[in-house]
Amino acid sequence: MDQTACAGNVVRPSGKADGHACPEADRKWVLVAAILASAVAFIDGSVVAVAIPAIRAGLGADFGQAQWIMNGYVLLLAALILPGGALGDRLGQRDVFAVGILAFTATSVWCGLAQSPEGLIAARLAKGAAGALMVPGSLALIARNYPKAERGRAIGLWSAAAGLTTAAGPLVGGAVLAAGGEAAWRWVFLLNVPVGIATLGLVMLRVPRDPGREGQGIDWQGGAVAAAALGLVAYALTRWSQGQGDAVAVAAGLAGLALLGGFVLYERQRDDPMMPPELFASRVFSGANLLTLLLYLGLGGILFYLPTTLIEARGLSEALVGAVFVPMTLIMASMARPVGGFVDRHGPRWPLTIGPVVAAAAFLALALTAPSGGFWTAILPAMALLGLGMGLSAPPLSTAVMGAAPDERAGAASGVNNAVSRVSQLLAVAGLGVLAGLAYRAAIPADVSGLDGVGFGERGEGLSEAAEAARRAAIGAGFRALGLAAAGLALLAALVGWLTQEGAPTREGADAPDPANARSA
C-alpha cells in the first residue's frame, strides 16, 4: 500500500502516483534538514586537508598518522555507507537519519577534544561510521518526500550544497586557522556541534516520519559482507596513499574485490536483498555511477592536492589558499536551481556531457597555472570555470541516480552512489597521489642533494637554497601531472554521460521507470 508522509510526524495512506510526497508546505523543511546535515558531513571531509599541518604541530603526529587522520573518516564512511542507506529503507529514513546526526555531532566533540594522534584517529573512524547513517539518508528523504516532477530542482539544490560545502571546507578551515592560535584546529571540528544540534531538532520537529519497509527483515549478512569488502578496498587505497604499496595493501585490495564479487552473488540469491541487483540493469543508474567515479576521481585529486601545491610550492598563506575556492562556490550556488529545473524538463544528458567537458578544461587550466601562474589572473578564473563545470554536472547526476530507483530503494540507491563517491576520493588521494609523487621525483635534478627523504608536499629540514627551489618546482611538476590526468578522466566522464543518460524525461510529472523496466546497459 502506498503511503504519504505528512506533517506532524504522521503517516497516512495515499493513492497518488508519487506515493510518498508530503504536502508542499512541509517539503522545504525536508530540504533544509538534508542540506544542513550534508553540509557538516562534506565540510568535514575536506576541511581537514588545510588543518593537517596545524594538527601535526599540535598533537605531534607524524606523516603516517596525519594520513590516517585525513583518510580514516572516508575509510569508515565508504565501508558502511551502503549498509547505512539500506538500513534507512528498512527502518525508516528519518529515524536512521536522526541517529546518524546525533552520532556525528557526538564524534565531532570527540575529535575536538582529542589529546593524541591515536585518539583523533579513533574519533575520525567513529565519525565516518556516523556519517554512513546520515549521508545517504539526506538524499533519500528528498526522493521520498518530493514528487518526481519537482525532484530535479530539489536534488539540484542539495547536490550543489554538497559540492559547495566540499569546496568550502578549505575556506572555512583557512579562516578558522588564521583567526585562532595553536589550538585553532580544534574549532574546525567543534563548529559542527551547534549545526548538528540545530539540524537534529529540525528533523525531529518538522521532517515527516516514514514507516520503512514493514514486514521485511534486515539483510545483516549482506551488510556485513558489503562493509568488509568496501572497508578492505578503502584500507588498501589508504595504504597506497601513504606510500605503502606493499603485500598487505595488495592482499587487502584483492580480498575486498573478491568479497564484492561474493556480495553480488549473495544478493542475487536473496528474495529481498539489501542491494537489488536489478538496479544495475538500468543504463541510467549504472552510467551515472560510472560518471560519478570518473569525474569525482579527478575532482578529489584537485581539491586535495591544490592547497598543498599552493602552500608548499608557492608559499601562499592558508587563508589565501582557502579563498581560492570562493569562485567555484559562488558559481555552483547560482546554477543549482536553473540546472535542476532544466533537468526536470529536458533530462540529464546534455548537462552530464557539457559539464564534465568544462570541468576537464578547468583541470587542464589548473594543471598549467597552479604551479606558477598568477593567483588573481589565472588560478581564480580556472576555479570559476571549475564551478561552472561542476554546477552543470552535480545536480543532474544525483537526479539521474535517484530517478532510476523506485522510492522504496531510495536509501540503497543513495548509498551506492555515495559509496562510489567515497571510493573515488580514496582513489584520488592514493592513485593520483602516486602519480604526483612519481612526477615529483622525476622533476628533481640529479645534482640536487638533501631531498631523498622529502616526498611530494612535504617540507624538508635545513634545506639549501637550491634544494628548496628544486623542491618547490618538483611539487609544481607533480601537480601538473595530476591535473592532466584529472582532465582525461573528466573527458571520459563526458563520454559516459552522452552514451548512458536520457535526453528527455520519460514523462513529465510521472514516476520514473523501475530499474527492471529501464533500458539495460
Protein language model features and the residues they cover:
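12-transmembrane solute porter fold
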Residues: 29-50, 248-252, 259, 272-442, ...
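Hydrophobic transmembrane-helix bundles of small-molecule transporters
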Residues: 178-292, 298, 316, 474
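Helix-loop-helix hairpins in multi-pass membrane proteins, especially solute transporters
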Residues: 89-91, 95-221
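Extracellular/periplasmic helix-loop-helix junction of adjacent transmembrane segments
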Residues: 51-79, 119, 319-323
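Membrane-interface helix termini in secondary transporters
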Residues: 54, 85-86, 90, 175, ...
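Transmembrane-helix exit segments and adjacent C-terminal regions of multi-pass membrane proteins
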Residues: 2-30, 265, 460-521
